[in-house]
């Protein structure tokens, strides 16, 4: 903890304009299975508990020196379930990722049991912070040339994010290829939708 805290403070002192610092898991599907991490997972009833607990500890340690900085956590892949019993510091920001969402249905579609689980996760995180952000996806990362029919679901999901109090939405779309799945049209439509999620 002391090493990470020292590094966080050093980075923030070097970058006084920063509003966020991210304390998040690696971009891999695996996590630590040591006894300490397992104990935190059991205590807070979720796989992301070790990272969330650690980030919260950092947030509490820096809030006096850096009152305008939010410590961002990233519920992602294995850590998309909210912790039970962990009360976050007010300077925690949650950037909820939609990696595990079904792309064919909107989040509130009761016929999609998969998305109803993800909706419950998002709702749970929204209750834990006033600093909710969304990291959404609009690409087929397995094959950039394949279309991904989700504009309709994004349209309704963006509205739902706003209803849950999201302060910002970022969409990771395809940028790897100019000729994949109407990328330029997608980016134009997403830009318009992000600017005005309640458009008709």
Spans of model-derived segments:
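Active-site groove signature of glycoside hydrolases
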Residues: 5-41
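Substrate-binding groove of N-acetylhexosamine-processing glycoside hydrolases
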Residues: 13, 41-200
